[in-house]
Amino acid sequence: MQNISDKKNAPLQEEVERAVEVLRRGGIILYPTDTVWGIGCDATNAEAVDRIYRLKRSENKKSMLVLCASADMVVRYVNRAPGIAFEVMEMATTPLTASLPGAAGVAPNLIPAEGTLGVRIPDHEFCRRMLRALGRPVVSTSANISGQPTAVGLQDVAQEIVDGVDFVVNPRFEGKPTRKASSIIAFGEGGEVKIIRE
């Protein structure tokens, strides 16, 4: 099913509702974030997560992060995150992914052996509304075949990816992304901090 948004003048909330409907059915979407365009699905749906791995031809499974609407949502899906992680996320002035211990409640095929979950709270209107409406985290992985260059804008996304998703969000809701991957900081249960990517 090709489901590219064809409603050029659809209001933001209508586009959010269309994306959420696809996510609730177990579909995957191509959508703008605060960094680069991403492929996403309901992070609690293991079949949808597996579809993304197959679409990206990813051999390095269990490396995708999730977007959450708020810190309140984060704590529902990680049960051993130290308080400092939330302080750092709140103070961040650029997109930051926090690798947090104690992943719980998401699809098992998202959780690596060490039990962590990469989480970002996006500063992006479309994403925030979508996450609030869905009420669950959404997978966010770069919209490219593994090993290929990151697709910064929709125009950079390979046709294979576009054809492989169930819905493509209208690019006019892109906002002002940074056009580069987020920083990544890993937090230990005891508050240890390790910068993975600046």
Which stretches of residues belong to each language-model region?
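Active-site-adjacent structural elements in enzyme catalytic cores
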Residues: 1-198
